[in-house]
Amino acid sequence: MTPGELRRLYLIIRVFLSYGLDELIPNIRLTLPLRVGRHLFFWLPNRHKDKPLGERLRLALQELGPVWIKFGQMMSTRRDLFPPAIADQLALLQDRVAPFDGALARKHIEIAMGGPLETWFDDFEQEALASASIAQVHTARLKENGQEVVLKVIRPDILPIIKADVRLMYRLAGWVPKLLPDGRRLRPREVVREYEKTLLDELNLLREAANAIQLRRNFEDSPMLYIPEVYSDYCRESVLVMERIYGIPVSDIAALEDQGTNMKLLAERGVQVFFTQVFRDSFFHADMHPGNIFVSYEHPHDPLYIGIDCGIVGSLNKADKRYLAENFIAFFNRDYRRVAELHVDSGWVPCDTNVEDFEFAIRTVCEPIFEKPLAEISFGHVLLNLFNTARRFNMEVQPQLVLLQKTLLYVEGLGRQLYPQLDLWTTAKPFLESWLRDQVGLPAVIRALKEKAPFWAEKFPELPELVYDSLQQHKLLQQSVDKLTTQMQGQQQRQGQSRYLFGVGATLLVSGTILFLANAVEISIGFIVAGVLAWFIGWRRTS
């Protein structure tokens, strides 16, 4: 380790011990050195004994800074790794960091743009409009048309911090399989690798710009969701320029009610937006926490969502969407056998999984959910229960499904905050059934033919030659098979003759031996010679 890494490691140890997180170390033989080593830091007692473990973990991550805050946020979606009390506390982590100096932001933008800010913008506001761990936002106007915009700029010093902390996380992850009995199954290095990829993706604002453009195109002229326009000509890897929006934060229930917002319709539209993104577009905003969602001031009776911060997105392939939709419908029909079969058919669990055992495990975990009214059943927790059960049957972690589960929990929690009587299943079921019908009905066949038509139009002139080549290959293959069959038959015949000669030879040798013992020497020699000769001929036939 470098001196810098050692200093950072000591800081992490100091923070963890001051919050009493050594309680997380399991009491097993392998961890004895760690538990003994704890006493070497006797000057770092637990200063927060009055708080539960989950809250102490959340506070420790907040104190360690933005990289660890975002890591905790990601871990809050991995409820297979943590008990609910800890996962719930991690979900409360807020990515709020004091802004860095506006003059430094201005300088960094000018470096990225390659010239003075006034070349492209007027009225640049040096005081940040908002700030987070990775970037912060400033307002300005485009010089060319006076359009109000926001400039999102990456923190200049964040990359070295991320790299240093991620290196430490990899080192810590390497200890987990040695310290925890179940550590290997948790695949800690893969968890850190996934987190590192997420962080590095967020550092590239050109990627976020592309995501926002795609989402805006998907919901163009939609009455449900508006995505601000991105000004691509001004975007750089560390600077994003997009339209400034005005709206009510979706978490401000009082303000929404004061302007007469149709809360029931708003909640239902949140669900519809989510399922439209997932099943129609295969491209969904995967960071839909309340800080990234606003509601337009216009038409409160016909409310419109406004989405920002498209740095994290998810996608599902056609097979995943099909199996996910069928899983939901089978679950709410309480067809647990079908749920188990779908997990096997999709490849989410190994093909040799015992379907009966899997069905029973799903039934045991999920049946109690139906003790509640349908309106109170959580889609997110349905997915959580299904995936946690499947992991006991060696289900591989599917990153796209983890993102989907996190987003669904956000959407569901938000919807019920807006309208507590929201029946998510009643809202979603018609959409899912309609989508499934569209995938297997006549429209799906026609659509598939249209998609394949250019390919077959290109290949059609080559078809006679391909058929001829195929017939020739079949003929050659048949000749090879016939030749091989003849060779095998000849070999089997020779082996049969050899076995017969070995048997005759053995009989003659035994008989010759008996005659020799009976003093019939001359006759016995003839039998023995004949036996040896029979063995020799049999051996030659096997060669």
Curated annotation (Swiss-Prot):
Disulfide bonds: none annotated. The active site is at D287. It is a single-pass membrane protein. Residues 123-501 form the Protein kinase domain. Its main location: membrane. GO terms for cellular component: plasma membrane. Its EC number is 2.7.-.-. ATP binds at L129, A130, S131, A132, S133, I134, A135, Q136, V137, K152. It is an enzyme of class 2 (transferase). One of its GO terms (molecular function) is ATP binding. Keywords: ATP-binding, Cell inner membrane, Cell membrane, Kinase, Membrane, Nucleotide-binding, Transferase, Transmembrane, Transmembrane helix, Ubiquinone biosynthesis. The chain crosses the membrane at residues 514-534. Pathway: Cofactor biosynthesis; ubiquinone biosynthesis [regulation]. It comes from the Bacteria. Is probably a protein kinase regulator of UbiI activity which is involved in aerobic coenzyme Q (ubiquinone) biosynthesis. Belongs to the ABC1 family. UbiB subfamily. This is Probable protein kinase UbiB. It comes from Yersinia enterocolitica serotype O:8 / biotype 1B (strain NCTC 13174 / 8081).
